[in-house]
Swiss-Prot record:
One GO term of the biological process aspect: translation
GO CC terms of this entry: cytosolic large ribosomal subunit
GO molecular function, one term: structural constituent of ribosome
Region (Disordered): 1-22
Record's keyword annotation contains Ligase: no
Keyword set, alphabetical order: Ribonucleoprotein, Ribosomal protein
UniProt record similarity statement: Belongs to the bacterial ribosomal protein bL27 family.
Xref: SUPFAM superfamilies: Ribosomal L27 protein-like
Native source organism of the sequence: Shewanella oneidensis (strain ATCC 700550 / JCM 31522 / CIP 106686 / LMG 19005 / NCIMB 14063 / MR-1)
Keyword Ribosomal protein: yes
Protein's name according to its UniProt entry: Large ribosomal subunit protein bL27
Entry superkingdom: Bacteria
């Protein structure tokens, strides 16, 4: 004979896995060609000189050098470049 009333199930209690987005290499850091600089959704950061952009908007180094963050243009867009 049960001495506790049966508990109803809940429909909550789930969450998606984190996607590990964000800046992976910061300003002034040395990078090798192919290194991922930023993982992002959309273009929060734009590709500058010697930086490529993947189909998921990931920015990566096209050449070896140092990472440089800069704000340019009338809309104050953030660009990431690689200086040799």
């Amino acid at each position: 004979m049960a001495h506790k009333k049966a508990g109803g199930s809940t429909r909550n209690g789930r969450d998606s896995e984190s996607k590990r987005l964000g800046v992976k290499r910061f300003g002034g850091e040395s990078v090798l060609a192919g290194n991922i600089i930023v993982r992002q959704r959309g273009t929060k950061f734009h590709a500058g000189v010697n930086v490529g952009i993947g189909r998921d908007h990931t920015l990566f180094a096209l050449t070896d050098g140092k990472v440089k963050f800069e704000v340019k243009g009338p809309n104050n867009r953030k660009f990431i470049s690689i200086e040799a």
